[in-house]
Curated annotation (Swiss-Prot):
Keyword flag Iron: no
Name assigned to this protein: Protein BEX1
PTM summary: Phosphorylated. Phosphorylation of Ser-105 protects it from the proteasome.
Keywords on record: Cytoplasm, Developmental protein, Differentiation, Metal-binding, Neurogenesis, Nucleus, Phosphoprotein, Ubl conjugation, Zinc
Region annotated His cluster, chain positions: 117-121
Gene Ontology biological process: cell differentiation; negative regulation of protein ubiquitination; nervous system development; positive regulation of transcription by RNA polymerase II; signal transduction
Keyword Transit peptide among record annotations: no
UniProt modified residues of type Phosphoserine: 105
Organism (species): Macaca fascicularis (Crab-eating macaque)
High-level lineage: Eukaryota, Metazoa, Chordata, Craniata, Vertebrata
Main localisation: nucleus
Any Pfam family the entry gives: BEX
Amino acid sequence: MESKEKRAVNNLSMENTNQENEEKEEKEQVANKGEPLALPLDAGEYCVPRGNRRRFRVRQPILQYRWDMMHRLGEPQARMREENMERIGEEVRQLMEKLREKQLSHSLRAVSTDPPHHDHHDEFCLMP
């Protein structure tokens, strides 16, 4: 009985390790999909396909491309958000100034006793 239980435990542990290994291999395959085509062979040597070598440019593999871009330029979404906030803030300020000017001019016109200078209503009156 004990030997059957030991076998069952061993089988379960073997299945678990096999599943873990398969998961690791799948993760490695997914991680390897984004790797560059030209991989370093030795220090400074890169595989160049045969044929017309002048047209084929060997590109150095970029390791941790996204990390490099984020640290060199800053996070693009955050930068765009800051620029948009600055632009929107400036537009709101300009609109508020225009609104204040219009409100002020209307309130001054209503308060002032002088007739409006640009109102030529009398000139175009057709009544005799």
